[in-house]
């Protein structure tokens, strides 16, 4: 299954790692791709990074793992058409 994780902090990375260990493809959405360079190298096969828009477009299931104050903006950047009809899990912290 393709999992899109919106948010690249500790929670988002931990969830992404868990889904990767279960054999899923995971894309982590971030505003700063450079921040995830080391994570991507360690995560290995099935892992990728992208913008919030690209991540929401990619995922069959979307995980929202942003800080509370960034959640509304992350959802706007993801694009409502990319979220429509998908399972969305909100673990906002």
Spans of model-derived segments:
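NAD(P)+-binding Rossmann beta1-loop-alpha1 motif at the extreme N-terminus of oxidoreductases
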Residues: 1-45
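Rossmann-like NAD(P)-binding element
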Residues: 44-47, 52-89
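Active-site beta-alpha turn of Rossmann-fold NAD(P)-dependent dehydrogenases/reductases
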Residues: 92
């Amino acid at each position: 299954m393709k999992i899109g994780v919106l948010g690249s902090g500790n929670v988002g990375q931990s969830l992404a790692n868990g889904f990767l260990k279960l054999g899923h493809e995971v894309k982590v959405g971030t505003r700063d791709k450079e921040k995830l360079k080391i994570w991507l190298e360690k995560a290995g096969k099935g892992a990728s990074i992208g913008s919030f828009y690209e991540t929401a477009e990619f995922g069959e299931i979307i995980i929202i793992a942003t800080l509370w104050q960034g959640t509304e903006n992350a959802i706007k950047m993801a694009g409502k058409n990319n979220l429509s009809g998908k399972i969305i899990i909100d673990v906002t912290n």
